[in-house]
UniProtKB/Swiss-Prot annotation:
The gene is tmk. ATP binds at G13, L14, E15, G16, A17, G18, K19, S20. This is Thymidylate kinase. NCBIfam families: DTMP_kinase (TIGR00041). The lineage of its organism: Bacteria, Pseudomonadati, Pseudomonadota, Gammaproteobacteria, Legionellales. Keywords: ATP-binding, Kinase, Nucleotide biosynthesis, Nucleotide-binding, Transferase. InterPro entries: P-loop_NTPase, Thymidylate_kin-like_dom, Thymidylate_kinase. Its EC number is 2.7.4.9.
Length: 212
């Protein structure tokens, strides 16, 4: 992404990890440095992407939406987001802060759904053509604690209704992916909000220092 002047920062993690709060904090920190930002989310972020999100998240499609269909819908939404939102923003120097990206698919579909990682990687290569974030923060939280926090937000969506074993597989896969990709920054999200925000602030300030 050296030809693009903006930066893509991705916040990853299980339900209840505090991704939305982290996105808001990153935006605030960047704004203090007079950096123009936009935020987005996956799946979604575009008109088509939000329609696909409503399908993927809808509890009515429990036991109806095939895992392969879900995977393809996610990549369809991601392509639209990259081409319609992320790349145009990066090209004019804006920094994009995304709630989820490619790592979620590897963790949720590869780990949670037990899909073949080789297939996912091949699909990724075809759809994304090597497009990657400049910085990924993974908020690591115990699955049980994450679901308690998520439940406090209200009714569960189709993904949130999965078993706790599903989320443990995702959690384990995230850890494997972080070990395989040392550029991903893992932050302990089991701690207090103040401690988590302090860690995020340190990472972002260092990243800004090296990229301005």
């Amino acid at each position: 992404m050296s030809s693009l002047t903006g930066k893509l920062i991705v916040i990853e993690g299980l339900e209840g990890a505090g991704k939305s709060t982290a996105v808001n904090l990153v935006v605030e920190l960047l704004s203090q440095k007079k950096i123009s930002t936009i935020t987005t989310r996956e799946p979604g972020g575009t008109k088509i992407g939000e329609i696909l999100r409503s399908i993927i998240k809808n509890p009515e499609y429990n036991n109806v939406l095939d895992d392969r269909s879900e995977l393809l819908l996610l990549y369809a939404a991601r392509i639209q987001l990259i081409e319609q939102v992320i790349k145009p923003a990066l090209n004019v120097g804006q920094w994009v802060i995304a709630d989820r990206f490619e790592l979620s698919t590897l963790a949720y579909q590869g780990g949670g759904r037990k899909m073949d990682m080789r297939v996912i990687n091949e699909l990724s290569n075809f759809c994304l053509k090597g497009f990657k974030p400049d910085l990924t923060l993974y908020l690591d939280i115990n699955p049980e604690l994450g679901m308690i926090r998520a439940k406090s937000r209200g009714k569960f969506d189709r993904i949130e209704q999965e078993s706790i074993e599903f989320f443990h597989r995702i959690h384990d896969t995230y850890h494997i992916l972080v070990k395989q990709n040392p550029e991903i920054i893992m932050i302990d999200a089991n701690r207090s909000l103040e401690e988590v925000q302090s860690s995020i602030q340190s990472v972002i300030e260092e990243f800004i220092e090296h990229n301005l």
